[in-house]
Amino acid sequence: MNLYEKEMSSILFDLVDKHGVVGVKTSFEDEGASFNEVVRLKETANQSGTKLYIKIGGPEAKRDIKDAMVIGTKGIIAPMVESPYGLEKFVKSVESIVYDNESLQSLDLAINIETITSVKNLDEILQSDVVNKLYGITIGRVDLVGSMGIDRSQINSETVYKTVSESFYKIKKAGLRAMMGGGVDIHSKSFVERLHKEGLLDKIETRYVMFELAKCLSDFDNNLSKAQKFELTWLTNKNKMYSYMANHEKSRIDMIQGRLLSER
């Protein structure tokens, strides 16, 4: 591990030990994480005593599922599930790869509800024969408000709250864990607290960090700030790594160009 990764481990260990963090999350989908990046995050999670969760590129992204299992993920999340069929494709795809029943039982499967179409079809999704294979459902607010034609600045509005809370009520009634991501920052505190008081929310997610809600709320602003520091350190690490690689290739490019010019 390099210095940045050691700092990440230190931040994450503190978050796990004292602030309710229950996992690190990364994504082959919207984030476009590479296999090597996910391996490094997995090592950081291991060093900090927590688990890694991976969002795959789609409900039937079998290559991503295979990579996630090789890396050793605790959970797999399918994005943009908008119908019972999408849910069924996801579950069947996982089951076609994770053939060992014990491994399958220990794997947390979740889907993202993140469009207004998903919300409208939620009743049907929850009535699917395979919904009992899920650990939980995450509502992704950024894509949700975009699909509703609402500006992101209104993500904590009453209109969005009504849509989210009604969806979580159905999710909890189905016996699933209710999780929320998308625009989770210090400005969403009252939004999160309302859901918690109504018994509708179990976990929240920043881009990379997953919190168990009850413990997180005890020092919400500080906990979210620490999660942002973890993300900043990781992004700085990636920036340094890829800058080094680019500079290394640039020196090779310059050398080859020099050779070609000398041959003229």
What are these regions (language model features)?
Residues 1-264:
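Expand to "…catalyze enediolate/carbanion chemistry for C-C bond making/breaking, isomerization
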